[in-house]
Amino acid sequence: MESIVDLPAQTDRTANDHVSAITGGYVDPALTAIFDGLRETASEGPSPVWSVLNDSARLRAVYDTGLIQTGPHPEVDQVVGLTIEAVGIPYAALNMITDVEQVHAAIASRSGEIGEQRTYPLPDSLCVYAVVSGSPLIIDDIADHPVLRDHSAAQSGVVGAYIGIPISDDAGHAVGTLCAWDTQPHHWSSGEIQIMTDLADVVKNVIFDQ
């Protein structure tokens, strides 16, 4: 399996460093590589991004959760609902990333209104960035993000602020993210980031029966 480390290297950062780097005009080369890689075609040759996404062991871990095939899981739904209350944000989801699409395994909104669309192409996913990099993606204001301001979620106004914590099995294969977002900019505090990280651990334990 070709790793994301074959992309431009990311240094280790604390939660606050992530926020500072992403909102302060810093252009993360790994994010740029993923953004470009998701738009490459097969004719352009093998890409480290697609090597991660297409890895057979990672895909086996995705499907072994059963969330792609069977849909809603009561305990996962409960954690995702709790995420909205704990972080105080309008939307939260557990999104699984296959080799072709993002799938809502669970989604909740503060208003109770949820769209019918359950799957999205990977170029339209934000969660795929956390899965490929293996690191949280934290965005205070996507309109000011040096890379992702051109993302479809930003252009459509669906996402103003976003946080996605990757969820991996014990072998380190990232299968998806626990994420939360707002249509407006939002500063993610260190406390909120820690809450999301803790809840992602809960989801991991549920879906991998730990």
Per-region residue spans from a language model:
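A generic "structured core" feature
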Residues: L126, D169, I193, T197-D198, ...
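Intrinsically disordered, low-complexity terminal regulatory regions
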Residues: E2-P121, I193, D198-L199, D209-Q210
